[in-house]
Amino acid sequence: MCQLLGMNCNVPTDICFSFAGFRARGGLTDHHRDGWGIAFFEGRGVRIFLDPAPSAHSPVAELVRDYPIRSLNVIAHIRKATQGDIRLENTHPFQRELWGRYWIFAHNGNLKDFAPQRSGRFLPVGCTDSELAFCHILDTLATRFPEGAPEPAA
């Protein structure tokens, strides 16, 4: 199974300390060698880094470990491939836009025999079950709420 790291803060914070240990799990202290990615939410934007190389040996992961990017929300993923080749397009987290907002998705697990109808505006670029599930979720939301994001409940 994959490894996930998330951070949610009330003030912008860097993830350098936590990411240092997490990065090592991608081929050094654990066997998750099939790519990695991390997404930092910054205002309405998302800064995302992806690499199909093991995170423990990735110069990009080293940069992320050493560069204090401050964010309120961070999602990181280290991949152990179960479906889809080790390629950039199969590396999590995945990003799409819906209702003028970026959505990020990372998944741990294997969705055997998951084959939803591929219709709608969200189509996978790679060939993982995770990206297919993400596209299906977004298609379902867009169909259910065609006028835009629902208002939060009071």
State where each predicted segment sits:
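Extreme N-terminus nucleophile/cap motif
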Residues: 1-59, 74
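Short histidine
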Residues: 112-154
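Short acidic (Asp/Glu) patches
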Residues: 52-64, 78-100, 117-120
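Residue-level signal for inorganic ion chemistry
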Residues: 38, 109, 133
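Short coil/turn connectors at secondary-structure junctions
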Residues: 70-71, 99-101
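Conserved beta-strand-loop-short alpha-helix elements that form
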Residues: 2, 103-113
